[in-house]
Amino acid sequence: MKGYSIILGLLALAACSDNTPENPGEGGGDSGEIVSVEKSVTIDAGQTFQKMVGFGASDCWTPAYIGKYWTSGRDRISELLFSSEIVDGQPKGIGLSMWRVNLGGGSAEQGDESGIVDKSRRAESYLTDNLSLDWTHCEGQRYFMSRAKEFGVNNYVLFSNTPPVQYTLNGKGFSQNGGSANLKADCYDDFAAYMAEVAKHYVDEGFSISHISPVNEPQYNWDGNGQEGSGWKNDEIAKLARELDSQLTQKGLSTNILLGESGDWEYLYKVKDDASRSNVLSAFF
């Protein structure tokens, strides 16, 4: 039985205004009073509240194109992302230790027939029309994975916005199925097998695939033509997770399944909008 994980991220929202005061450092309304914002902070290094598993980012979307086409700039960009080297007191990069890799649905191969207007929101897939796997696909993503490995990154998360178009109900990488999964009823096992096979391929290539995130922000319908995506109900996610668990076990992989993906904090802990797509923690854990 694979492990089931939940990784939570913090979204910080910043508001800006065109009405900048003449003296930004002053406050207190019309009084002109200066308000002190000094704070005293004490850090106890001996007390641990949580463990950070990794510091990561995602290759979705433009790195796929930078890695494939921008050969003059990609080496420096990858250094900025992954290097932890410090020279003369200056870091050469931000030292990412985790890299999130998009398992695209194949809309890039469809071109304009994909229905996705923005070319940068189309993504390649390893799955071909005859349902074989072509490991020469996703060249740009493979470049960044290899560079991450060179710089010592040892945690990779495979994630999916949509099932491969060969398995979707509408043959597209975006959904027209409302809040339900854009996945044929008889293709849950096929989709799971595909994700597990990609994970095994990269494990065999020497990459540590720590997690697979099989769905992305499932509370949204993704029924526009802006990018790849699919809505999912909790019971559909559970069914897919069981199939994926079986496939990972069969292949002898220790890769964990990342559940609890959510488009909004509140979907995690309470019923919001659609009960069948929210209260995620109670539904899965």
Residues of each region from the PLM?
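Short hydrophobic transmembrane-like helices used for membrane targeting/insertion
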Residues: I6-I7, I34, I212
